[in-house]
Amino acid sequence: MDAASGILPDYAELFCRSNFSFLHGASSAEELVERAAKQGYRGIAITDECSLAGAPRMHVAAKAVGLPLVVGAYFGVTPDDAAPGHDPGPGAFGLVLLAQNREGYGNLSELISWRRMNAPKGTYRLTPRMLAAPPRALAHLRGVPDCFAILVPTYPARADVLDAQLAWFDALFGERARLGLVQLQRALDGAHREQVRAAGERRGMHIVALGDVTMHIRSCKPLQDTMTAIRLGMPIAECGHALAPNGEQHLRTRQRIAQLFPADALAQTCRMLDACHFSLDDLRYEYPHEIVPAGHTPTSYLAQETWAGARRRYPDGVPDTVRQRIEFELALIADLKYEPYFLTVYDIVKYARSKDILCQGRGSAANSVVCYCLGVTEVNPQQSTLLFERFLSRERGEPPDIDVDFEHQRREEVIQYLYEKYGHDRAALAAAVSTYRPRGALRETGKALGVDPMLVERVAKEHRWFDGSRDLLARFASVGLDPEVPLIRTWAEIAARLLNFPRHLSQHSGGFVVSRGKLTRLVPVENAAMEGRRVIQWDKDDLEALGLMKVDVLALGMLSALHRAFDMITAWRGPPLPDGRPFRLEHIPQDDEATYDMICRADTVGVFQIESRAQMSMLPRLRPRGYYDLVVQVSIVRPGPIQGGAVHPYLERRRIAAGEAHGEITYPSEALERVLERTLGIPIFQEQVMQIAIVAAGFTPGEADALRRAMAAWKRKGDLGKYHERIVAGMLERGYSREFAEQIFEQIKGFGEYGFPESHAASFAKLAYASSWLKRHEPAIFLAALLNSQPMGFYPPAQLVQDAKRHGVTVLPIDATKSGWEASLEAQPGAAPPDGRPAVRLGLSLVRGLGEEAARRIGAARAAGPFASVDELARRACLERRDLEALAAANAFATLAGNRRDALWQAVAAAPERGLLAAAPIDEAVRPALGAPTEADDVFADYRTIGLTLNRHPVALLRPALDARRLSSAAALRDRRNGRLARACGLVTARQMPGTAKGVLFVTLEDETGCVNVIVRPELLERQRRETLDSQLLAVSGVWQCESDVRHLVAQYLEDLTPLIAGLRTESREFH
C-alpha cells in the first residue's frame, strides 16, 4: 500500500487453480471470478495443473463481470533423472505458463496434450529435457514460444539449486522468463523471500507475486484438507506436511497482498496481464476439407446433394413450399458458412448406411428440410409445425447441433471410421465431467476424516439415488448417528460441499470434434479410458459456450433391436417385396389399429420411450390413435409440460374434442391458434414456446432461440428473469391480458425444468410406433431382438421374457445342443416359416461365466454333427472346466444329462484335469445317486445362473402362503373397484422417482399374473425406507385406484417378505 496516498496497488492473480485441478483446487471457476472481482483485482489467470479443462467456465464467468482473464497452466517439473512416482528431491520446481497470444495458446495446448497422451490417464510428467529438446515432430514447442514462463521455486528455496535452475530457465525462455514469489505466511517465508530476491537480482530476472491460489475464501480450508487426504489415500490425521499449514491459498484482499509483496513484484503481475492478448473468443474452428470432392465448393456440393435427396424424398415432384424452404435454408447455411458441418454429418451418415448400420438424426436437426433431404433425419418437416429457428438462425451465433443415433452395438464402427478418415491428431471425443455424487462424496470424505470404514459404508448405502445434499443429515440420523456431534456435522458439511465437484474427465456419450488441422492446437487432448480413443478436455457445454462444432455420434439400443428384428422378419417371412430387399422401417404399415389398441392399453413393456411407469399411466388417458398423438405422448410426460401445468388441460381438451366432455376449445388469438392448434391450445413443445414469444410478444426468431436456451439454463443460472418484463410487455402491447401474459411466463418457467422439442419427439415417435408394431404383430421376433440387444431399455431380460410369455410367446430353454450365442427363432409344430409364430430359443450369452469364444466352439463342433454326451461335447468343443460347470449350472445339458445335478456331475467328470491329478486313475463307474432338484431349486438356480426362469414364476411357488396372508395377485386386482382397500405382493422390478414427482416413489411389483403399480408417498417412504428400498419381495397394503384404465395401489403399509425367497438373485432397476 502506498503509505502517502493510502491507495491500494493494482494486482492480478497469475497462479490460480480451480477445482478442475482435481483434488487440488477447492473452488469453482465462478467462485474464483466472483471473489477476484469483489476484491478489485485487475485480472486473474486460470492455471490448472497440466489442464485447460476449467478454462471455458472461467472464461464465461470472467466475461460476464468484465474481468480480464489470462489462460495458462501449471506444471510440476521433475529432474530428468528422477524416477516417476518417487520424491523428485530439491531439483523439482513449479512452472506456470501463460498464453500471450493465439500462437502461445496453441503451443500450450499442444504441450499439455503431448504430456497427457504419453502418461497413464490422469497423470503427466514434465522434465527440463522435455521442455528444451522435445521430439522432432514437436520441435516447435521448445521453450513454449509466445508464453510467459514463471519458475516457482521449491519451498524453501536453496541458493545453489535456484541459481542452477535460473541459468537453465533464462537460457530457454529468455525475456519471457519470470521468477515467482509465493508468500503464504509459513515459518521460512522471510528466508525464502530473500533467496528469491537475491537470485532474481543475480540473474536480472523479474520477480512476480503469486498467490498459489487453490480456493476463493479461507473457509474452504477444511475441504482442501479433505481433498488432499482423498488424493493421498490416507486420513487427514496422517497427511502431515502434505496439508497446507494454513488457509492462505485463497484470494486475499489487496491490502493483505500489499503487505506481503514488494511493489515491483505486484506491478509485474499487471504488466504481464497487459501483455497477454489472448482470449478463448479468439479460437476459430476450421472444418475438415475432405468431405468436398474435387470440382466442388462446400456450397455447390451441399446444394447438389440436397436437391438429389429432395428428388428421392419427393418422387412425384418437390412441392413448391418444400422448394422454397430448401432455398431459404441453403442460403442461410451458406451465409453462415456452415456447409462443411452439414457435409461432415452427411458423410458420417452415408458411411453408416453403406455398412447397413441403422441411424437416425434427432433433436433440433429434425426441424431442417435440408437434413431430411440429406437422409440425416427421417421426420418430414412438412408434416409437423417444426421451427427451423430452433435449429439454426443468424442471431444464434453458434453452429447448429445435429445429433445422430446409431445402433449401440455398431457405433464403434462409426467412431473408428472417423479416426481412420481424419486421424487421431484431428479427431477426438468431447469430455464428460464426472462429478462427485452423494454416495461417493460420503465415502471419500468419511475415509478422509478417519471415520470407521463400516460406518462409512452404512451411511453411504443409506443415501439413495434420489437423495440430495439436503438429505445428508437425515441419513446420518437414520443409521443412529447424532447430527449434532461435531464430527458428524463436519462430515455432512464437507460431503455437501464436495457434491458436484469435478472428479475426473471421462468421455462423452458420442460428441465428436473433428478439425481441419491439429486438434491439439485448439484444445488439449488426452487418452480415454477405452483403448483406441482420445478425449478433449472440454465438455459439450464448454464447446457450446465457445461456439465450437461437435458432431454427436450417439448410441441407441432400440436401433440395434429394430435392425435385428427386421433381419429376423426377412429370414423368417421372406423379403416384403418382390425386389428382394430386406424388411426395413418403411415396410411397417402406418396407422395400424391393433397396434394403437395395444398402446392405449399401456401394454408397452419393451417398447421404445413409452414403457416407463409414467408413460404407461398416461397412455390410457391420452389414448394415442395416430403418429402425432405419439409425438405428444412422448413429450407430455416430461418436467416441462408437467411443471408448466399443461398436462391436465390438454387431456381435458382431448376429451372435449372427442365429444366425451362438455366445453369449448378456444384460443386467445388467431395468431396463437396457428401455433397451438395441433395441441388443442396447450403448449407442449419447446418450439411452441418459441413461437408464442415470436407471434405474441414480438421476439425475433433468434431472440426466441435465446429464450429457449435461457429456459434450459434458468435452474442453474437464473437467466430467465430478464425475459419476464419483455414477454409481459410485448403481450400487453399486442392486446393480451396481463393475467394471460403472466400465465404464459409461468408455463415458460415450467419448460425450464426440461421441455421436449417437437423435433426430438417426432424422431422418437417413429421408433416408438415401430417397436409397438413389432410387439403387437411379431412378439417372438421382438423378444429375441430385445434379448440380443441388451443392455438397453427399462426392463431386464427376466421381465421381458415374463411379458412375452403372457403374450403367448413360446420361449425355449438354453440348450447346448441347439442354442447359439444369441437368442434365435425355432419353428413350432404347424408354424414353420414363413407362416405362424416362431418360438424363441434362449442364447448362451445369458449363461453367467461362459465366454463368447467357448460358445463359438460349441457351435462349430455342433455343425460337424450332433453330440451324444456331455463328455463328447466337452472334448469336441475343447471346453474348460469353468465352461462346463457354467453350462451345467444353467441346465444347458438337460437333453444330454437330465437334470442339473446329474449334468453337473457329468460336467466335472468330463472336464480335462490339470496338474498333479492329471494322470490319476478315476473310477467313473462309481456314481452317487443324486436326487432330482425341486421346482423351487430349479427356479432359484435359473435366476442365479441366467437371471430368469422359464419355470413357474417365483411368486407362483409362494401363492398358497400369500393367499393365507390375503395378498391378491395382479390379475385379481384388475377388477377391484376404485377406492377399495387392497393388498398385493410381488418381486420389485423397478423403482422410479421422477424429478417432478415431489418425492413420490413409483414401485413396480411383478407376480405370476402380471404387474402392480405402487405409489409410495414421501412420508411413508421416510417412515419405511428400508422396506421400500431394500426389499426384493414386497407386500403392500393400501387403497386401490382405477380410473380411465389407469390402475395403481397407493401404499399405506409395506412389509418386506424377502426372507421367503432367500437366495433368489433378482434384478430391479432404479431411475430418476
UniProtKB/Swiss-Prot annotation:
GO terms for molecular function: 3'-5' exonuclease activity; DNA-directed DNA polymerase activity. Pfam families: DNA_pol3_alpha, DNA_pol3_finger, HHH_6, PHP. It is found in: Cytoplasm. Disulfide bonds: none annotated. The keyword Nucleotidyltransferase applies. It is an enzyme of class 2 (transferase). GO terms for cellular component: cytoplasm. One of its GO terms (biological process) is DNA repair. The keyword Cytoplasm applies. SMART domains: POLIIIAc (SM00481). It catalyses: DNA(n) + a 2'-deoxyribonucleoside 5'-triphosphate = DNA(n+1) + diphosphate. Its main location: cytoplasm. Keywords: Cytoplasm, DNA damage, DNA repair, DNA replication, DNA-directed DNA polymerase, Nucleotidyltransferase, Transferase. Its EC number is 2.7.7.7. InterPro entries: DNA_pol3_alpha_NTPase_dom, DNA_pol3_finger, DnaE2, DnaE2/DnaE/PolC, DNAPol_HHH, PHP_dom, Pol/His_phosphatase_N, Pol/histidinol_Pase-like. Signal peptide: none annotated. PANTHER family: DNA POLYMERASE III SUBUNIT ALPHA, ERROR-PRONE DNA POLYMERASE. Belongs to the DNA polymerase type-C family. DnaE2 subfamily. DNA polymerase involved in damage-induced mutagenesis and translesion synthesis (TLS). It is not the major replicative DNA polymerase. HAMAP family: DNApol_error_prone (MF_01902). This is Error-prone DNA polymerase. It comes from Burkholderia pseudomallei (strain K96243). The lineage of its organism: Bacteria, Pseudomonadati, Pseudomonadota, Betaproteobacteria, Burkholderiales.
